[in-house]
Every structure is written in structure tokens, then in C-alpha cells.
Amino acid sequence: MRQYFKTALLAGVLAAGSMVMSATADTVKIGFNVPLTGFAAADGQSALHGAELAVDQVNAAGGVNGSMLELVVYDDQASPKEAAPLAVKMITQDEVVAGVSGSYSGATRAAATIFAESKVPYISAYAIHPDITRAGDYVFRTSFMGEVQGRAGAKLIGEMLGKKRVTMVTINNDFGKSLATGFKEQAGNFGIEIVSEYEYSIKDREFGPVISKIKADKPDAIYASGYFFTAGPMVSQIRAAGLDQPVVGQEGYDSQKFIEIAGAASEGVMITTSLDRDSNVPETKDFIQGFAKKAGYPADMVAASAHTAILVLADALKASGSGDAAALRDAVAKTDLSASTGRISFNALGEVQKDVQVQIVKDGNWHHHSVISDPVLLAPPAE
């Protein structure tokens, strides 16, 4: 039944797809699926603010080839079941020229399939599952796939921090598994011994049993995947139990809300991510200032990544000079753009190639720790 539903959706898209990109208007519509309700709503709101800021900036500068950008927003609740029909609606009814996902991996994968089959460009802002770009050559990603970020975590712990005995705490979903895969792949190359790995559910907020096991492991460092709403309680409980080893996380922690939840326990926590709060790069500084003014709270990774994805499309729309989907897709593929999350370019699979930022909590805020710039280590797959 599920396959029939998917086939029916795609058939409807393909029947209408030939006319989607041919329309010309005073506005250019970009679809944006994002979780505005449900467990991921806080990330969704940040992503939406980031995307809206990018649209505002592009339009204030004159738009794209004389047309204004319009963001067509739908709440996908971070659910694949919601995202797939919304993708169809964006393409067939709203006639968007392209789409951006401001959502998590499950919803992004579902929408990516629809966009790819209908040959409409689609950019994943921050979802990390490796199969997203494999949906087709119309799909791109402006943040790191999970394996790449996991490799960076291994370099950070094993080489940069010099910690060799590591306990892993892995959230049991696509996000956590892909990060763990990358970390394990490179751990040995940086002299890391993985003492133990413990898994937990996205619904978990009490970590006593796991923390007792970590205590017994006596690791040099803890590599723990999660989101701000799981990592906050986890780190707070780790420190309350008297464990003072470095905790290294990833972009899922990248929110001021993590610091609010973990409180003083957040001090010293490090993450691999895409946004450098202390950057002197004009595009990053302007974004951080503009976001704080628009949203009323500090910028985070999901906001910066959504902002970047919209600017990539705006740049490609200018370069392609037409409403032709294939021309727009080719222009996205040739992107070479300085954005809030770094210099953006894509490989043959549509995966981003850029440095990894390392941030650390100091005095209740995220700050620059270091940059991992290693083209070989960070190279995403090309097929």
C-alpha cells in the first residue's frame, strides 16, 4: 500500500511536472518544508527565520533577475508521511521553481524523492542521512552528511584533544547511526579505542543507567550524539554524576536552548558544526546580526543552514537566467558561494565540500574553538 501511494504521488507530479518550470511571474516561488509543530518545532522555527531572512535580504537587494522571491512554507512535523504529499503540493499546485528542506532526515528523504523524480531542484539545509542526495541528481545538501561529521569528531577527540579511550553514546535513529558510522570509521586512524557504545531513544530524558556504565568505563572522553533537547538533560546528568571528561557532540546540540537546558554543565562542551559565532567573514557576521534582530535570540546551525540553502538557490537562479529546471539544477551544481556556513560548493553527488567548525561553550555561549580543514578526511562520497 505504501509503495502504491508513493507511485501515485509520483505519477501526479510527473504528469504536471512539464509545465511547472515554464511559468514566468513577478515572483519566484521556493518551497520550504519545515517542522513548525511537534518535537522538532524549535529547530523548525529557527530554520524558518533563517530562510525568511535570506529571502528578505535577496528581495531588498532587488530580487532575482527582476523578480521577488516568495517562500512557500508548509509544516511537515518532521514526518515523512506529511512531507511527501506536501512536496507534491508544492510542485503541482504552488508551482515552485525549487524546494528547500528545513526539516529532519526522514521528512527530507521523503520529499527529496518527489522533487528528484519530478526534476525540480531540492536542497537539504541540514538533514544528514546519506541517502538524501542519492534520491537523484536534482538533490543537494548544504550541510555535512553524518559520516563526514563523525569523522571530524574522531579527529577532534583523538588528535586535537589527544584523548584515546572513548565511550560513545548514540541516539538510535538515522542521525545518530550515521554519525557513529563516521566516527568508528576513523577512530583507529587517530589512535582511539572505543571502550563501549550505548544507544538511547529520542524520547529518553533520564540517563542514569547509561551514566553508571560510563563511570565504570573510565573513558578519556565521551562522544555523544543527540539534539539539544536530549543532549541538554544528558550532559546535565553526566556532570551531576561527577564525570568531568570532555563531552563532544555535533550540530544537533547547536542551539542556545542546549545551554539553557544543561545550564552550568554545558560549560566546556564541544561540537562539530557549520556555524562559527566568532567569525570575521562578512557573510557570517551579517547573518548572525540579522538573525538576532529578526528572531530575537542568537543564531544557530539550523538557521544558518536554511539561510545558506536559500542563498544558493538565489545565486543559481541569477546564473541560470531562466525558469528552466535543468538550467537551474546545473547552476546549483556549479555553486561557488561564500555564505554564513562557509564557502559552498558541491561534488558530483550534490554533497557540500567545506570545513568543519568546532564550537565550545564558554561563559554561557557558543564560541569558536577551532576549524577542521582536511579535504581528504572530510570528502563526502561522490556517488
Where are these regions (language model features)?
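C-terminal segment of classical bacterial N-terminal signal peptides
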Residues: 14-24
